[in-house]
Amino acid sequence: MIKRHALLAALAAVSFAAAAPAFAANPMVGGAPMMDTKTIVENAANSKDHTTLVAAVKAAGLVDTLSGPGPFTVFAPTNAAFAKLPPGTVEMLLKPENKAKLTKILTCHVVSANAMSPAIAKMIADDKGSHPVKTVGGCVLQAKMMGDKITLVDENGGVATVTIADVKQSNGVIHVIDTVLLPKN
């Protein structure tokens, strides 16, 4: 009886150890654990680095959409990324009369797919260094590699670098970026 329990315990330990890499933890973002069982909106709301993004998503009326089943890839600008915009821009965009413009900007950060960084890097390589990324907002970003980092070039030539990649969500993936991507003027 004891041998049987020891054998079962050993088999369970080996099985768990073999499966451990499949359960790799998501990175921390903004000081908060990102849970792959939560939606993009739920996780972003927990990140202290994404309070401006969350406020913008609420002001644009995109909470329900980004809480939906997806899959979505969101290139999520940090508060510091929003702070790089000209003074007063964020405040102006958050006003109700600018909802359409804000929605356009935010949806230029969203792709209707679950695009992990290895897949993006492969598409960049397959396309000889630059891969067009069509967003739900109608923008076409250019994904490129800068060393081992993925960068995104917006329609105005602005460049955002992915600083934290592959943050899995229940409805897609977040890639944290350091610059707000803007649609063509």
Task: Go through the PLM ranges and name each one.
Residues 12-14:
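Repetitive helical segments and hydrophobic/amphipathic motifs
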Residues 16-24:
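Sec/Tat signal peptide C-region and signal peptidase I cleavage site
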Residues 5, 23-185:
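Mature, structured domains of secreted/extracytosolic soluble proteins
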Residues 1-9:
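Bacterial N-terminal signal peptides that target proteins for export
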